[in-house]
Amino acid sequence: GVRLVGSEMCIRDRYETKQTRSFIRVREIHFFEAHTAHADEADATRQIEQDLEIVDNVMRDLCLPVIKAKRPLWDTFPGAWYTIGIDAVMPNGRTLQVASCHHYRDQWAKAFDITYENLEAQQQHVHQTTYGMSERLLGAVVGMHGDENGLIMPPAVAPFQVVICPMIKKNSEVDTVAVAEEVAKTL
């Protein structure tokens, strides 16, 4: 079958009149998106399933509990057949949308006449999807794993797994730096 996959990193401006919050409610949104076109609805649906597997892997690595839910019609992306929202569950119980998947069927392809030639030499409209995340994902990581004492990154993404800080004391009989170096070698 036919499958076309493209990616886009872009900035969108939003007229945000409410109080902004870093990484959560911003006027300038950074999107990281994948756009796909498929020969049929079934292949586009498989793409959505693969996208949701990626979500599972990313959220597991970031130690973020999420809810993946099909949005009601009023909350579906304009022009989409359906939208699946991915919401991180924050420590206070509130949710923060960090990603979404949209299945358009062939609605946009018909509107913009996006076609391919099938094996019978007939023009067919493609079935499209999009999948994306924004910097809210970083906000969710900070909100989940940070507090007034700082940020502890999840092991899968932490630049350092362990930091050994020798506590040097005057007139100590123990060479704490040597002990720290030995511990580091053991780890």
Task: Show the residue positions of the predicted features.
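Single conserved hydrophobic/aromatic residue that forms the stacking wall/gate
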Residues: G1-I11
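Conserved thiamine diphosphate
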Residues: R12, T17-R21, G146, I152-M153, ...
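Extended, charged alpha-beta segments that form solvent-exposed binding/catalytic grooves
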Residues: R12-L96, S100, T115-A121, C165
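Hydrophobic alpha-helical packing residues
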Residues: D51-M59, L137, V183, L187
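Generic long, charged, amphipathic alpha-helical segments
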Residues: G150-L187
